[in-house]
Amino acid sequence: MTEAAEATLSADIQLIQRIIPHRYPFLLVDRVRDIVPNQSAVGIKCVTMNEPQFTGHFPGLPIFPGVQIIEAMAQTAAVLVGVSLDLADKGAKVYFMGIDGAKFRRKVVPGDVLEMTVTVKRGGGKVWKFEGRASVDGELAAEAEFAAMLDIPKG
C-alpha cells in the first residue's frame, strides 16, 4: 500500500468496537481517521451534554474531565495498534501502562469536537509508546506521552 493510500485509512464505530473492548459509558472515541499504520492516527470524540460524567463534573458547569481526554487518546492509540496489526475480532487488548508530561490547556465542553492526534514513538512489539495531542478547533486542549502493552491471546 502506498503512503498516500495508507493515510486514508479510517475506523468507524463498528470497527472500533471490533478492536477495543470499551463500551458505553467508557467508549470515548467515535471515529478514527487518517490512520497511517504503525505511525499515527486522529481520533474524534463528539462531546455532548448527554455524557454521564457531566452529572457530577460539574453541575451547572459541564467540563469534560481531563483524565478522560487522556483515556480518549489511549483508546485512539489502541485502535491505531489494532488496525496496524489487523487485530479486529481477535480478542487482543491494549493496556494503558503509564503516562508522562500530561498537560491540560483548555476546557472541553458540550458541543466541542475533540481531535486526538496520536503518534507512535516506539512500537511493533508488546510495549508501545505514544505522543498524544488533543485539540478543539485547532486549539490545544491536552497533551501527554503514554505507554501501552499489547496482549494477544494465543490460539
Curated annotation (Swiss-Prot):
InterPro entries, alphabetized: FabA_FabZ, FabZ, HotDog_dom_sf
Pfam family, one: FabA
Gene3D superfamilies: Hotdog Thioesterase
Keywords from the named record: Cytoplasm, Lipid A biosynthesis, Lipid biosynthesis, Lipid metabolism, Lyase
Top EC class, one word: lyase
One GO term (biological process): lipid A biosynthetic process
CDD domains: FabZ (cd01288)
Active site (record annotation): 57
Compartments where located: Cytoplasm
EC numbers on record: 4.2.1.59
GO CC terms, sorted: cytoplasm; membrane
Molecular functions per Gene Ontology: (3R)-hydroxyacyl-[acyl-carrier-protein] dehydratase activity
Catalytic activity: a (3R)-hydroxyacyl-[ACP] = a (2E)-enoyl-[ACP] + H2O
Main subcellular location of this protein, as a coarse class: cytoplasm
Domain of life: Bacteria
Family as reported in the entry's similarity comment: Belongs to the thioester dehydratase family. FabZ subfamily.
PANTHER family: 3-HYDROXYACYL-[ACYL-CARRIER-PROTEIN] DEHYDRATASE
Function, as annotated: Involved in unsaturated fatty acids biosynthesis. Catalyzes the dehydration of short chain beta-hydroxyacyl-ACPs and long chain saturated and unsaturated beta-hydroxyacyl-ACPs.
HAMAP family linked to this entry: FabZ
Protein name as it appears in the record: 3-hydroxyacyl-[acyl-carrier-protein] dehydratase FabZ
Organism: Cereibacter sphaeroides (strain ATCC 17025 / ATH 2.4.3)
